[in-house]
Amino acid sequence: MNTRIFFHISPERRGIILYTSVTVTGIRGLPLIQKGDDLPRLIIEKCALEDGDIICIASTIISKAKGYTRNLNDVIPDDRATRIAEKTGEDPRFIQVVLDQACDVLIETPFTLTEVSCGHVGVRSGVDASNVEDGLVITLPADPMKEAEEIRTEIKDLTGKTCGIIVTDTCGRSFRRGQTGHAIGWSGMSAIRDFRGDSDLFGHTLEITEEAVVDEIAGFANLIMGESNNGVPAVHFRGIPAWTGHNDIYFKEGEDVIRKALKKV
């Protein structure tokens, strides 16, 4: 699936970088990923890269290549996992894997909402039983930032091109139905484009505007990747101008009003 997007932005508008066009291409033809596969090499065989390109990669294929899976037949659920599973109607072994991956459990039912070690908060610790062999579940990479950096470095070594890498995961959203792609790891860019201190169209100083660019790119990548059996686990972006900002995409515990409210439930 190849989509060309045209942005037309007046150059008088705050002097921001003028977008001309962004090309978004699903990287097709990748094999079913197995443990030990050289993912960066497989990607560059299907995709000609240039400096400044961005590649979004589904966390599931990184986990499969690295062997971040669990066999449920080897999992013995404890009392907590069994208790939660009785309420949610899920396999207690699956819930045990969810708890094993979590560093904090925000809610247990009607679904488990957890935080994992990288700071990401999501349903069931991101543990996934889809697109994997029967009896296995896929877990998120423990350090997706490190995974993104390693992929970026290997692609640079193989091609000489300096690209950005975003590791994506499909997540639900508070207050809205449906799932979208979120960035859980990135390299070669900052997560947030910080507009604080800039002026709006009427000259007012912006005080709180911070754009989660990596999530916006991940969300579009997820549209191209699709779900179910679409089979496009990586997406290539060309033409996105560089931006400046910071990486503090996750609220600190004291800042997160939703976490505070959930802890009171």
Feature-to-residue mapping (PLM):
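Short, Lys/Arg-enriched N-terminal segments with co-localized hydrophobic residues
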Residues: 6-17
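N-terminal and secondary-structure boundary signal
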Residues: 17-265
